[in-house]
Amino acid sequence: MYSEFRSIDGIILIDKPYGLSSHETLQKVKGILKIKKMGHTGTLDPLATGMLPMCCGRATKFSQFLMNFKKRYRVIAKLGQKTSTSDSEGQIIHVRPITFTNLQLQKVLKSFHGKIKQIPSMYSAIKYHGHALYKYARQGIVISRKVRDAIIYELKVLGYSYKHKYLELDIICSKGTYIRTLIEDVGEKLNCGAHVISLRRLQVGNYTSFQMIDIKTLNKLVKYNINVLEHILLSVDNAISCFPEVNIVPNVIKNLQNGQKVKTHSGFINQFVRITEGINRRFIGIGKINNINELYSYRLII
């Protein structure tokens, strides 16, 4: 049975289509690539499109680091209307006139820069007793949610129309930022209300939109020649390329595999490091350096 699966290691940046959940998108890609072990990093709502990094094979060991990267979004908000779901799928529950000036808009957006507090929407994918909150919301059940921290690094106006009542924003934020909640909070501060009508994730960490591939294109390419994956897949260690490198000699690898510490002179005290081996600098995993310059393994792929 398992002979049907391919052994593929690496990271692929999928352009998630509108209407599919992140899990549904993952299953489609797994079916196309015939990969048994695969996972996505960073959930996108069905209404959202854009970058959904997926880790294949041994790259799944490092997916947590992808989740920690900054995210970039382009969002279009409808002004003057608040909905039950904070997006265009919900019912309009409040309508107010738009009275703010451009100066007031800039002042409000500036107030969201830096660390902010958010209460996630009931229509989010946060799990409660094993089920997503939005499943409770659809049954009319309201669950108490804890306030969460987020960081907004940039919040820029790309377009604004008083006549058509829309606001387009470019947002760079930390992991765990709820864009629908952010837009709703901005709308409240503008005293008019707002909800999301379009949301696209353009960037995760240093991965840009130019590196994405959509499902249809991926399917065509793989059917034509499976070897094209070599040009699409990013290397296993790409997710942690920002970490400093510690190169070790081959004869101490067994020590790391057995949970032993290896003396180094790296100076990267209490930091994650990429461990490479030998003169070819073969990537073998992630480690940490303790306060007496000893390297110990965190995740190995050998």
UniProtKB/Swiss-Prot annotation:
HAMAP family: TruB_bact (MF_01080)
Function: Responsible for synthesis of pseudouridine from uracil-55 in the psi GC loop of transfer RNAs.
GO MF terms, alphabetically ordered: RNA binding; tRNA pseudouridine(55) synthase activity
Protein family membership: Belongs to the pseudouridine synthase TruB family. Type 1 subfamily.
Transferase keyword on record: no
Keyword Isomerase belongs to the record: yes
Classification lineage: Bacteria, Pseudomonadati, Pseudomonadota, Gammaproteobacteria, Enterobacterales
Active site, renumbered: 45 (nucleophile)
Superkingdom, taxonomy of origin: Bacteria
Source species: Buchnera aphidicola subsp. Baizongia pistaciae (strain Bp)
Biological process annotations from GO: mRNA pseudouridine synthesis; tRNA pseudouridine synthesis
Enzyme Commission (EC) number: 5.4.99.25
Keywords: Isomerase, tRNA processing
Pfam family for this entry, one: TruB_N
Protein name listed in UniProt: tRNA pseudouridine synthase B
Catalysis: reaction(s): uridine(55) in tRNA = pseudouridine(55) in tRNA
